[in-house]
């Protein structure tokens, strides 16, 4: 009984006793907690592929191919802020090996282009724009390099670490370092044996609070697909023993759902592009995802407890295309409309327990229309909830009928259902690892159709 009461004291925002709560391991670090709060940020794929109309360059492209005419990182930041994104991750070096900064460890960089007479630095420009605009920045640095002559030799691992050091010590604080799982051949036909443990140790030495993304972390995991969808069941926990990055990584369903008893806190990030491709292609100008499609992806990623990394590739001018920008602004407007009003505001739930599991009943002052309930755990003490249900009271019979069957909650669960009008909502936790610690719940009427 004491544990149950403690749980509900936390639920009702009286958190003075939280330090006495026994955690359910593993628990997130403070860096994880800050990352979880970001929810949504942009990915930017930009480089020679933008101008060659390719997705994967071969490293043989002439550096002068990179020739943006109006590059404006401040425009990227302005649009990102209008979209409600909390940061931007830039492909500083993709698989072609072309560096968007004048790296001294490569001869395939913006320095060798004619853009700004070889004196340009996209990473610097974006870093400055993000600082000015109040956004955080991250970098994608591809380990695979199809241009570097030392790729496929032990020396290349040292070069890669030196390359990371250039970026991680020369451009300010980054919130995330992104590692792609691709590992193909270099210009000499050789594949590289990456020393990822050294890479990790070096990156953390340069920026101790950095979050590192890859198939298996160490900080953040891939969600197992590039469709922007995280599993309805989503544990922030993962077992990585016996798995590798790229080929040899965990199966898709494991990446998508995590491990219920995983030993490490490695939450899922959903990456998806606003267009069919990752780089800009003019032929895709009429295939940009609509605001409604983006909103549904938000529900399937952030709404399942992960983060959404949405790719928006600049065009050959070096600007976000007008169609992409309009869709992003429309996406933000839908989120604002959907979550603006919390229908539970001012209501105190009636709390009952059965076998230590809570039921929360919210009673409205009058019949109320809604189509979503938002639940959140206090994940700093571990992820606990395994299953839950949501019921609504019928006006004719007075009985409660089930409107949602859920599994995990984690950092956030946005449970959506067909619009209903009811006088009362009942939330029941039906299974959990330990005492349930929830933040105050929310209910919403989006005011538009949601496709589940």
Where do the language-model regions lie?
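Mature catalytic domains of secreted/periplasmic carbohydrate-active enzymes
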Residues: 19-419, 428-437, 442-444, 449
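Extracellular Ig-like/FN3 beta-sandwich strand-entry sites
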Residues: 422-424
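Bacterial Sec-dependent N-terminal signal peptides
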Residues: 1-20
